[in-house]
Amino acid sequence: MRVFLDTNVILEFFIEREDVRTAAQLFNRLKDEKAEMYMSVGSFYTMMFLIDKYLRKELGLTGEVRIATLRSLAVKIVKAISVVEHDNESLLRGVEDMQFKDIEDSCQYQAAVAAGCDFIITYNVKDYPHTLLPVFSPSDFLQYE
C-alpha cells in the first residue's frame, strides 16, 4: 500500500497538535501494515518553516538548541516518509487543473499520482474534489479496511 500524506497530517503528529492521538494511531497502523508513505518536497519545505516557527514561538527554543531540534525532527520525517519530487510537467498539471481551487492542493495531488499512491490522507478532504485517488481524513482512513 502506498499512501500520500498531506502536510497537515505529518505536522499533526510531529508537533503534537490538536489531533495528535489520531495522527499517532494512523502512523502506527501504516507502520504495522508496512505501508509506503510519501510526501511532496514542497511539504517538507513548508513543514521545516512551520516547525521552526513552532520551536521558536511556542517552545521558546533559540540558537543551537532550536536548530538541533529542527534537524532531529527533519531526519525523523525523512527517514519515515519518502519524498516525491515534481518535474515541470507534473507541476504544470497541478497549476492548470481547474478542478482544484488551490494550486498547492492540486500540486500535492499530482505528487501523489507521480508516486503511484493508492490513497491521499489529509485533514482537508474537501480540498481534493473529483480525484481519481481515494482521499481520506486520518480518522476515516483508520476505519477503512
What does each model-found stretch correspond to?
Residues 1-39, 54-60, 65, 130, ...:
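Short, well-structured N-terminal submotif of metal-dependent ribonuclease cores
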Residues 2, 110-145:
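Acidic, PIN/NYN-like endoribonuclease modules and their adjacent C-terminal/linker elements
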Residues 24-28, 71-75, 109:
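Short amphipathic alpha-helical segments and helix-helix/interface helices
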Residues 50:
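ABC-type ATPase nucleotide-binding domain
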Residues 66-91, 97, 128-145:
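Short acidic, glycine/proline-enriched helix-loop-strand junctions
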Residues 79-125:
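Active-site neighborhoods of divalent-metal-dependent phosphate/nucleic-acid chemistry enzymes
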